[in-house]
Amino acid sequence: MSEGQIPSSDVLGSQLGVGVQGASLYCPQENYTTKKQEKPQWLRPVDDTLAEDALDLHIVVKSLLCDTAIRYISDDKVLQESDADDDLITSDIDEDTDNQGDTSIVVNPVIPVVPKDVHFFKKVDVGNDSMFGVNCDTPVSFQDYIPSDLLRNLDDTLQESTNSSRPMQDAFFWDPTVANRLDSQYIQTASDLRNYRDGTEIIAYASGKTGSVLNIAVLTRQNTLHLNRHNNVTSIELHSPIKSIKIPGASESIGRRSNLVGIITENSFQIFRIESVHSRSCDVMVSSSEPLYFVEIDDLQVVDFAFNPWDLQQFAIIDIKGNWSIGRIPKNFNNNNKRKLQLIDNLHGTIFDPEELSSWKRIEWFSHFQKILVFDRSKMIEIDFMNNWQTEVVQAKAWSNIRDYKRIDDKNGILLTSREIIIVGASESNDPVRRISWKHDLDPDDTTLRITVQKVKKPDHILLVAFVYSMRHKRIYMHVFSHRKANLFQSLGCSTVLEIPGGTPTGIETILTLDHIDDESRREEDADENFELVVDFLVKLRNSSEVYYYALSNTQNSEPNKQETPIIVDHPEWASLFNNADEREKESIGALVSQIKLKERERISRVQNLIEHENSHDEDKYLQDLGYRLSIATNELLESWQKTKDESILSGSLSHSKLKNLLENSDSFASIPEFSSLLDQFFQYYQDQDVTFIGFEKLLHLFLHEDVPGLDIFYNKLLQCWVLVSPQAELLTKEIVKDIIWSLARLEKPSLFEPIQNEISRSLSGPYQDIISSWDMDDINEEDESNEFNFDSQFSAPFNGRPPFNLNSQSQIPTIKSSQSSGLARRKRILKTQSQKATPLSQSTQNLSVLPDSMTPAFTLMQPPSSQISFVNDSQPRNSQKAKKKKKRIRGFG
């Protein structure tokens, strides 16, 4: 067994364990790992079979799905009566109503909808009689005298209490009896079942000024990442604010989907049945049951309901006190005599707790058709309503409180508490067990936390993507679990926070995941190498009428959303920094992290290759070869500039180039100090060739706002900032330093600029030459500015007159000097620059404006003594050029 297969005592993060057995298990019978491994029998504490960047999700699609402020009027879409009792009679309406026009029209939100029972009367003029006015002559009533000192003290006390109180945004109040007022599911009508159709994806949501209008519409998909709502919307006025909307999900064992929509309003519970969906116009025909008014059932507000996944005609409800009941749904809503919802007399009970003050309650079916789960803030209770027994499964009164629960499938559900995300499953005896839990470290006092889950099916496992959101902010906490055979649940080890971009600072009212992801067609052997993850959901913000569609993917889209802000929150320092930032800072942080992710994806393969071959990679040999190639390419560039000198003068083009453009494969090294030493030697050598370079010290000062003596110091200071951003901070910092240096490193030849400047000046007409000649005529200011702003000394790398190698030696093989001498070399360069300003170069022995064809590279292996560098005198001496330039310097050209 290899060392990597032995379980170690690594920190498990916030995971509280795999099941109840332990964090690391030995599995002698089954192998849960991939086929490519050599069948290790150790069950790892987290699922590490996926690639590291497999869960690096970005927003690839953001679109407005619908606006609930736009209201619709529907005239005959609600079926109330029918001559036949069969509930399938209206299911074929889509084949018989091809010529039927649209029955819904868009109404201006300002114009109110007038009910039919409202009658209009003639205009009545109301007289403005004086008896309704205020008598100004009435004397002021007697008031008690209060000393001004007392009033002043009261004002000071009130101001102090106001300043010491919590901000208003923290004092957020919400109605716990209001659940999701938005839902979407696939439904199957009777016609779909007869014709073996998969069904139709619909959306149901509340709208209107009071939220009393139920809207049902069809969702259409162009492809996997584009979702649209059909414009033909069925709207029903319920005359009472809607508090909850649910479209049930049926069990996979019955082989069909439901066609029901359940609604809770302030005074009733009602169920709608979708009878048909027109195949072309997408017209939705619905029928409704009679409202079950709360005055008929103890006059208590019903806060939640659930449908039986195994019996679509059965439902369960629970009120604010914890009283629950089981009921039956009529098979046909089209008969007025059989439209009433019936509660079964002997199937009811209560979990009333006098110590529980919250009216928040939830009810959901469990692992069997006769078992339900009932929740309040402090406990989860399993109830078998057929055998008349119940047991308390979870008690959350001390350490944490229950926040939400969602059903995953017939055997599992996910429970959100104030401190954990818990996957609850059913054992072989259908008893609830705790599969796995993850400590999320969110605000334990936030009672608005909710959770939703999306299942992503893969060939050998299922991914459960959990979204935790709050009505207090716009951040979504995402954590992924994997579900493999034999009820093995594992965490994937890290969490991600996604900031919803745009809009005002507000909370998230609803996140609705869409059940359509199915990747069964992907081959199992390619699942881990080409892993593609796509999740999509609908988002409705608090106090907003717009519903947005989002799609997340771990692959880059052709048009990525620039406002995505995925933040890794496993580091407490980074999470604290992000939470305390304002909106503008968060936008900058999001853009920064997006660039980090993009850079990691672009260079992750090359960086990993460098790490794997770090020992076998000869760094010194690579840098030596890099120096040779850079020197040869520079010599060729200088020769080409000299050959095209006359053409450049006529065209007015300047001779300059980036070092990055001269080389390929210039980043395959890891030592920043040795790279800095290489650049120092390269700059020193080309000082005799009339070539200048940008001074890095001045430019690096702009990044850190402090003096930076070298690249190694710049790297260390950047590293201190990047350790909060990414676990790969060292590698990323090196890549950033390389990018900065190669993007800033430019070479130019100043001797070629003077003829171009003179040519441009001569080409101007008389008036323009006079204007240019009038610039900088003050000799005193000229001298001061010349001393203060000397471009040669501030923005050019100074030169030494000594080449880095002995060119007259035939036997000496040059090697690049170590980085320890770089500081001394820099000091010599500074002194040399100061001496150059006082003593110009002598042109009697050398003229550096012309390069021969036999130019010697800066880094050469062997140099014969006969190849000496010769120079040809230029037509215009360099000293006269400098004197002329100093006498009359033209701004903007020289």
Swiss-Prot record:
State where composition is biased (Polar residues).
Answer: 806-823, 832-849, 863-880
Q: Where is this region: Disordered?
A: 803-894
Subcellular location field: Cytoplasm; Nucleus, Nucleolus
Pfam families of this UniProt entry?
Answer: Rrn6_beta-prop, Rrn6_HB, Rrn6_K-rich
Tell me where it mainly resides: cytoplasm
Instruction: List GO molecular-function terms, semicolon-separated.
Output: RNA polymerase I general transcription initiation factor binding; RNA polymerase I transcription regulatory region sequence-specific DNA binding
What keywords are annotated for this sequence in UniProt?
A: Cytoplasm, Nucleus, Transcription, Transcription regulation
Name the domain of life: Eukaryota
Q: Which GO terms describe its biological process?
A: nucleolar large rRNA transcription by RNA polymerase I; transcription initiation at RNA polymerase I promoter
Q: Where is the composition biased (Basic residues)?
A: 881-894
GO CC term (a single one):
nucleus
Asked if the keyword Hydrolase belongs to this entry, the reply reads no
Keyword field contains Nucleus: yes
Known role: Acts as a component of the core factor (CF) complex which is essential for the initiation of rDNA transcription by RNA polymerase I. After binding of UAF (upstream activation factor) to an upstream element of the promoter, CF is recruited in a SPT15/TBP-dependent manner to form a preinitiation complex.
Quaternary structure and partners:
Component of the core factor (CF) complex, which consists of RRN6, RRN7 and RRN11. The CF heterotrimer may further dimerize to form a hexamer. RRN6 interacts with RRN7, RRN11 and RRN9.
What more the UniProt record tells us is: Present with 237 molecules/cell in log phase SD medium.
Q: What is this protein called?
A: RNA polymerase I-specific transcription initiation factor RRN6
Name its species: Saccharomyces cerevisiae (strain ATCC 204508 / S288c)
The protein's gene is named RRN6
